[in-house]
């Protein structure tokens, strides 16, 4: 027995098969697209801390991943027998098949999205919070673009799976490829030739549309991009076009309130107390370095200042006005207004990897509409990049920069919102020794310009040289709060000063 090749090749000229191909592509693409969106909402609900959201989402995923698609198809198609009013649309094989594919694929895609969302570093969300972005803004501009890039290979694979699963819709008489083939070989009994042609059509669809999706994946692959350093001529041109930022200057008027005042700040994680009644005043234009052994509460302290950590009790006053109290008493409107006056630079940089250096700096001002003019925003971003010595790298992505360069971009991003106060969380601890100097130079320049800064650091020489005061924390309390000159005065034999000098290694 041999195959009827003439019949086999004739199947590629049949209009019925090409119409069936259109049906397969249409139902698969719609199911993939709708399932993609619905699956994201299910994944978000499943990850929610609210039980009224995560429990129904978990049940939905569990149920539709457990029930075979064929069972769902037959059930949905026959649902009008229970609810006659649904017959107008569920009685149509295409719609019944689409609904069945969507609810089933939404359950699978929810897990794909969940893995993508979990892969986005926590620091990315914290950076968005520090830039005073809302939850939806962080999701839209930071989390979702990164999660989609991470999940794209698996999502492409799921599209291929849907194309193949669409063959099951033949069970409810949808004239897709398999149904068309079955009708043919039922008449001529050329089963192998017909199914071989059906397989070829499926391979063609998967190859064409899989290639399109893989092209999109390559376009979204940030690490594969390698923009070059701008030429010296281009840098001079951009420098001439740049617009200076409207920097705020410190007010030293008599009777002016402190820039920041912490009153009886307390913070615990379960039974472990991290901050035990911290009190601190910082004048406008003052630079305060916070030092201390690991676990002393330094980082936790500055993270409470911009609500990255909540307070158990106590309050924070910003320029004489209420800012943060414990969870029950903080005013959301006051918090949002105050957050715009505080910037933060993180130990691990937390630049947005899917954006260029220029886009990293432009994003927050554009989000807040400060300025509204996109061209002004871009020119101010060029000014900030020139200020930190990175104008030539404007079009590069964070992965192309050294650690020191990334931290300088992070500082420029913080300055883009013209904050009154900047918090630095160990800005040099993640850097190689030779890169530390370039970051410290930028911070020193800010100090000379009168920027109010709180710097958590292990760079003792730097703390003594740039700070107006050095605060030492230990066991969740401030052990010493003194000017560098007092610390270096070896005639002062008080126990606290001796301990501080020993810790700083200046004896």
Locate predicted features.
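Catalytic Walker B motif of ABC-type/P-loop ATPase nucleotide-binding domains
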Residues: 422-425
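H-loop/switch region of ABC-family ATPase nucleotide-binding domains
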Residues: 457-458
């Amino acid at each position: 027995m041999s195959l009827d090749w003439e019949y086999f090749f004739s199947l590629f000229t049949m209009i019925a098969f090409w119409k069936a191909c259109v049906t397969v592509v249409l139902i698969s693409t719609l199911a993939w697209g709708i399932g993609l969106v619905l699956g994201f909402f299910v994944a978000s609900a499943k990850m929610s801390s609210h039980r009224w959201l995560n429990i129904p989402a978990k049940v939905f995923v569990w149920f539709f991943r457990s029930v075979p698609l064929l069972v769902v198809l037959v059930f949905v198609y026959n649902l009008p027998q229970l609810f006659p009013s649904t017959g107008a649309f569920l009685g149509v094989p295409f719609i019944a098949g689409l609904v069945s594919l969507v609810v089933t694929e939404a359950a699978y895609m929810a897990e794909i999205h969940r893995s993508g969302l979990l892969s986005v570093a926590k620091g990315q969300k914290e950076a968005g919070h520090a830039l005073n972005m809302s939850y939806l803004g962080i999701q839209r501009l930071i989390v979702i673009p990164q999660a989609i890039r991470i999940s794209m290979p698996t999502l492409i694979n799921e599209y291929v799976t849907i194309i193949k699963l669409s063959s099951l819709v033949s069970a409810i008489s949808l004239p897709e490829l398999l149904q068309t083939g079955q009708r043919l070989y039922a008449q001529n009994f050329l089963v192998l030739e017909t199914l071989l042609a059906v397989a070829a059509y499926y391979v063609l669809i998967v190859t064409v549309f899989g290639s399109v999706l893989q092209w999109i994946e390559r376009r979204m692959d940030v690490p594969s991009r390698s923009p070059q350093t701008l030429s010296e001529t281009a840098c001079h041109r951009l420098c001439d076009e740049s617009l200076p930022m409207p920097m705020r200057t410190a007010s030293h008027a008599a009777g002016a309130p402190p820039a920041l005042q912490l009153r009886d700040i307390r913070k615990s994680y379960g039974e472990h107390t991290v901050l035990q009644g911290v009190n601190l005043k910082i004048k406008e234009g003052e630079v305060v370095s916070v030092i201390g052994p690991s676990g002393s509460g330094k980082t936790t302290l500055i993270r409470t200042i911009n609500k990255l950590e909540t307070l158990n009790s106590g309050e924070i006053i910003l320029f004489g006005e209420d800012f943060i109290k414990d969870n029950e008493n903080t005013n959301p409107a006051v918090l949002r207004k105050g957050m715009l006056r505080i910037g933060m630079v993180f130990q691990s940089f937390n630049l947005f990897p899917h954006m260029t250096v220029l886009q990293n700096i432009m994003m927050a001002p554009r989000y807040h509409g400060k300025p509204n003019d996109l061209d002004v925003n871009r020119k101010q971003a060029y000014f900030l990049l020139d200020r930190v010595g990175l104008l030539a790298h404007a079009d590069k992505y964070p992965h192309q920069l050294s650690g020191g360069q990334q931290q300088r971009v992070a500082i420029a991003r913080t300055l883009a919102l013209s904050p009154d106060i900047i918090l630095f969380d160990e800005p040099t601890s993640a850097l190689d020794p030779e890169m530390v100097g370039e970051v410290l130079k930028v911070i020193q320049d800010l100090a000379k310009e009168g920027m109010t800064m709180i710097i958590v650091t292990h760079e003792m020489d730097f703390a003594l040289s740039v700070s107006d005061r050095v605060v030492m924390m230990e066991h969740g309390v401030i052990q010493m709060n003194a000017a560098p000159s007092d610390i270096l005065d070896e005639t002062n034999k008080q126990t606290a000063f001796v301990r501080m000098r020993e810790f700083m290694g200046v004896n």
